[in-house]
Amino acid sequence: NNSLNFLGKVNKGLFIDGSEDKVIKLKSIITLLYPFKNINVVKKFIDKDNLNSIINDRFHNDDEIDFFSIDVDGNDYYLFENLKVRPKVICIEYNFWYGPDVKCSVPYDKNFTWEIGSTYSGASLNSLCELAKRKGYYLIALESHCVNAFFIRSDLKNNFEIIDNIKYFRTPKYY
């Protein structure tokens, strides 16, 4: 999970996961490695209708979120579309199986569950980049496993190289 990489760099954070096992493990990691940080871990299934209220319950309106990761193996596009806060950086999982040119996402289904091994999930990188531009974000990086895209808020874009999603699109080397 990309978010774990940022635990050492932030003092305040929120992790939301629907898996009891993952929540227990994450709480143990935070307690062991980062006991003095204000990191909340919430066990809850998120959807496009409850995402903002979960965030608002834990952050004040004037709190600026530095990093926000969306990785739900399905409804990522719709969560991003409905996200009201404006973090500096957003990391979103995309489905490389759709290729570089296609703009698509699985239809919204509050109860969507990704089946391990299935290529049917999430959204194409192209569709997420289009949505990001509408929301005032720009693509700055694709991680090496070809499943996470990093977007920077428009007021910070001059500090980064904006990349072209089609030019930089890759598929993982293990496929």
Question: What would you call each of these model-derived segments?
Answer:
Residues 1-70, 96-99:
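SAM cofactor-binding core of SAM-dependent methyltransferases
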Residues 2-5, 9, 54-56, 101-175:
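Rossmann-like AdoMet/SAM-dependent catalytic core
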Residues 21-30, 85-86, 98-100, 104-110, ...:
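Class I S-adenosyl-L-methionine-dependent methyltransferase catalytic core
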Residues 68-73, 90:
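Short acidic catalytic loops
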Residues 74-76, 96-99, 147:
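Short, catalytically relevant binding-site loops at active-site mouths
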Residues 74-85:
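A short, conserved alpha-helix within the catalytic core of class I
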Residues 87-95:
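Conserved beta-strand signature within the Rossmann-like core of class I S-adenosyl-L-methionine
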